[in-house]
């Protein structure tokens, strides 16, 4: 399960997710990727489940890059606890994802294999995603090797 080794602040505020992703929205390493089309918190368990689904489908072939990292702690109070008495303890970690963010990248597989692997992975994620290729970014005129 992904989580930071150490953090500056143990508890953080929730914040809000406005606008589109300005970083991590291009394919940097692979040839194929899935891109978020809506905003959400993605937990480390969901990232791991998607990674396992991709690796099961492509077996030993292909190389996978996980482009998001859960660096935000989410706190919870114990069940049946009265209001007040401070903020709860950190329970799990999430990655804040905005529309346009590239979640996973893949190379050394055919487009059909990548499309199916990412379809299986997208069922494990709480957001809608779209399949993109390096060619899509080159046609838009954007730099595909940002990052």
Swiss-Prot record:
Keyword vocabulary terms for this entry: Ribonucleoprotein, Ribosomal protein, RNA-binding, rRNA-binding, tRNA-binding
UniProt-recorded Gene Ontology molecular function terms: rRNA binding; structural constituent of ribosome; tRNA binding
GO annotation, biological process: translation
Source organism, top-level taxon: Bacteria
Keyword Disulfide bond listed: no
SUPFAM superfamilies with a match to the protein in the record: Ribosomal protein L16p/L10e
Key word Nucleotide-binding present: no
CDD domains named in the record: Ribosomal_L16_L10e
A single Gene Ontology CC term: cytosolic large ribosomal subunit
Leader sequence residues: none
Chain's role: Binds 23S rRNA and is also seen to make contacts with the A and possibly P site tRNAs.
Known partners and oligomeric status: Part of the 50S ribosomal subunit.
Family of this protein: Belongs to the universal ribosomal protein uL16 family.
HAMAP family listed in its UniProt record: Ribosomal_uL16
Stated name of the protein: Large ribosomal subunit protein uL16
Source species: Clostridium acetobutylicum (strain ATCC 824 / DSM 792 / JCM 1419 / IAM 19013 / LMG 5710 / NBRC 13948 / NRRL B-527 / VKM B-1787 / 2291 / W)
